[in-house]
């Protein structure tokens, strides 16, 4: 399953996350019960779940009213947190909750220049924040999202100034800025705080990676969590869940046109780029300006390696410009090496590179070294060995499927 958290319009807060997860299908009464029980260790809170509208859109709103606000040191906070033992919470949930608060504590320590054990929780130590985190974590596991591929879109952070325990600070708050380090953010669409430290810490601990756009998926359910304000735009956090259509990842595509390089230099560039970590390199003949023949060099690389590959491309080609296409979606089948026996002048073992979509074999190619070995042993031309081997593999796989037996001669 694939889940996308969408905070690009109204940001993310703790109660918005809980509301969106409940709206997606988490148990509302049990979630509220967990929240109130957790808050009781920090002064207590009342939790209510209701359906509201924000700028005309329906959403679930979770209202948490704390009886009092605690201001505690991080170590004392952890001690109080250890006292939470609701029967609906297991060790994995409690571990994730601790990770969320640790994320906040690390951010606070960084922005204030203190050690972790010197961090003092103010707003985050309040019962409502504890309720939000425990409720969000419970709902997350209640929906089994911990087994999904979870992504986030860019986070709207708002703007202006916000008053906290340390007086006025710019939006996003320093702790929020630290928590969202490495994640794409956008300002606005209003001059208020839209991304809170609690909501941001939940987000970064829930997601696998960030994306600018939705991944390929078949949408099955959507949940909307409302914020407390009702401005002119929909103040909601959206969570979308569905099934992945094809296994996929994202890569960066680099390309440039050259018309001044010899075949020897182009061959060397090809090898150097692959050695530098490029996933694939292609050279395509093109006609350039003034009808000059040239080459289009295309390089596919991992997103976190494109700058290094880009440097190699500039230095090796001497080109003055490279087109960069970030976040290119690429369908990728699961790849596996399987062994099978083939009958080519006797029974012989060969390895096949197999592409799988789920449990279904979509593609199979004999490994070149094994095909060459069989060709040398039998005197049969290589292309015939490849054709015969792959046909036998397909027949063997078909027979195994018919017998509903996963082995069928395949290892």
From Swiss-Prot:
Q: Specify the superkingdom.
A: Archaea
Annotated keywords: Nickel
- Please name the InterPro entries in this protein's record: Ni_insertion
Q: Listed GO molecular functions? A: lyase activity; nickel cation binding
The record's section on PANTHER family has: NICKEL INSERTION PROTEIN-RELATED, PYRIDINIUM-3,5-BISTHIOCARBOXYLIC ACID MONONUCLEOTIDE NICKEL INSERTION PROTEIN
Membership in a protein family: Belongs to the LarC family.
Q: Which HAMAP family match?
A: LarC
Protein name (database record): Putative nickel insertion protein
Species of provenance: Methanothermobacter thermautotrophicus (strain ATCC 29096 / DSM 1053 / JCM 10044 / NBRC 100330 / Delta H)
